[in-house]
């Protein structure tokens, strides 16, 4: 993905003969040293991708190194990125991924300078380089590694200067957070107001339209948080039951962690409702009216209520962060793990175990939602991480519209962006201790579903990769802020004095010089039409009916239970509750009896032939038609090679995603193999060389 925009240059002394884009550059360097780029080469190469506001801070000739790689070129530092331009390289316009030679400053996770065999300095923002480096290693947060070696001689000062430029650029980037919704150059070509490709859920109309799409007739849009005075981490609007007044919503939300009370996440067509909320604020002292309002919101008009303890059997944030760090270290090109021990090391990261846990938990919740008409409430203390992950996975398993390209983007916007997932904190851009790649974990889970059910998803692996890469690309505020309130405040949409919120895509007043702030869904401003076309999965079958996977035919699976049946789902167990709220009588919160919810012994496909051990009054409960139940045992969980091994192109062969262009590439590769093997055919078989069967028999 290509990006750029406006920014500010840094207070770094310019190099002599510093090349400007399209202007004069350094002269060629005579002698045996590596030739320096000419002004035309450097200027034209950068001008093809640079946008107004990007400035070259420093550059140095070098060689990109790696397994079987020794590529001469130029290392360039700008106020937005670090890029390596190979000699004679031209930017390809049809690549669906970001250039392997470009690293956004915000994407650099680790910077190391090397001199000799043992002298290594870890360079943090603001560090002082203690020696002239012979090599520079940039470790990307997206599993890439840029290793550049510098030649000795007159180039040593340039190597020092480009390294210091990177250090200072990263420092100023982290201090002032210069990425303030960079305005892309193509925006200037758009006249008038620009309609967002995906509803950003910043207006009352957006929420009302989405509510109608889901058919949630018993729900309405609450405006109680329109000024962000109930919960700053929530959006200004959300769905609550029709019969609950906004005054009751305000009082009820005060008894939940960070004011994140129960609200609708998704309405199942069969009648069930999936809710999410934060943990109960035990220290509060609600009155009877407040407790009644909380219970009414949790029940959502249903007689059956199931509280799901989201974090049970799920990894902690620290576990996810540690697993991701181990995975990134394992997948780097310079990993020291022997090839015969690589799979064991991969298992030791536990990343795939955590993917498995998420899919298993989402499958359990999906059965709870579809088996009977009820209210299923996802409860997590902060309500900003795993509630969004599990809610999104449940909708992917149950809602065909969520598996479309438009639907998936809307799902992420609603359950992650508008719901206040702390992207900036979790993705490690603030240096906080709460770093954890929860959203990349969700993308891995979505990729697993795409591999297991390729005909069910309209989007392709290339789209998931583009979204994965967009996490740390500083052209929008979508993933660079923690809450909708922060995005609105930073972009000038929210007036802290008048408490007036202006939607991001509203038409500015006449004479206003405010820039148009983009969302991550404005793909056409960063990608060509050819690239966007690869976001679609050619194997998607919108008419595909998954009912054939289930042998049982059910006329009506969604039936009500007895009045006031309350349950807690934790660790695969349904436990009856005497009450929903913990403030009345905490000693009688849990009853002693419980019913086990069995898991499949060998494969999740066997769940279609099992009866789930739900409470007896619910009767026999076979799986409903249309429910996608992913496999999560053993080799059913696969390794996302195209994402995590992108820094090792030698292992990417044969891992093409399912796109038309990928099939063409595979065909070209097979034709090349045939051409290589054709000379090996014996002379007496030359007359038969046009027969494909003869050629294939020679190959085998």
From Swiss-Prot:
A Pfam match: Myotub-related
Domain Myotubularin phosphatase: 201-644
Region (Disordered): 1-39
GO cellular component, one term: cytoplasm
Family: Belongs to the protein-tyrosine phosphatase family. Non-receptor class myotubularin subfamily.
Protein name: Myotubularin-related protein 11
Natural source organism: Mus musculus
